Design a protein with these regions (language model features):
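Long, charge-rich boundary regions
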Residues: 2, 29, 105-113
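Short loop/turn motifs enriched for small/polar and acidic residues
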Residues: 32-36, 65-69, 110
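Short, flexible, mixed-charge glycine/proline-rich loop motifs
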Residues: 61-68, 78-83
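Short functional micro-motifs and their immediate structural scaffolds
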Residues: 81, 94-98
């Protein structure tokens, strides 16, 4: 379960920013999550309350925004979304696709006090 390591890293980031920016409490943590990142937000939501006790992240609201997957077709040059169950280019039907986006996982913003 890599979500535990991600949750700890998230809390470490908040603690580091609290020290650097001089805030005492994070109220809201907004994250961007790629459709193909493999991260399960519900696991982070379950782990976060216990893992963040006694830190600047304790009690913060976690918000996730999904970033859709993006692909480039080697056959026709199409760039964009592809139906998951199809796994082929919507323009030419080709299957030589390279993922160019959708694996991301990062903190987009912190609301603090």
């Amino acid at each position: 379960m890599h979500e535990l390591a991600l949750t700890k890293s998230l809390i470490d980031l908040v603690e580091r920013e609290a020290k650097n920016q001089g805030f005492t409490k994070a109220l809201e943590i907004r994250m961007k999550l790629g459709e193909y990142s493999g991260v399960i937000p519900e696991y982070i939501l379950d782990l976060f309350p216990e893992a963040s006790k006694g830190t600047a992240a304790e009690g913060a609201k976690l918000l996730f925004e999904q970033i859709p997957g993006r692909f480039r077709c080697a056959g026709c040059g199409y760039e964009g979304a592809v139906e998951r169950r199809e796994a082929k280019c919507p323009q030419c039907g080709g299957t030589a696709l390279k993922m160019t986006g959708g694996r991301e996982f990062f903190v987009d913003s912190l609301k603090v006090e």
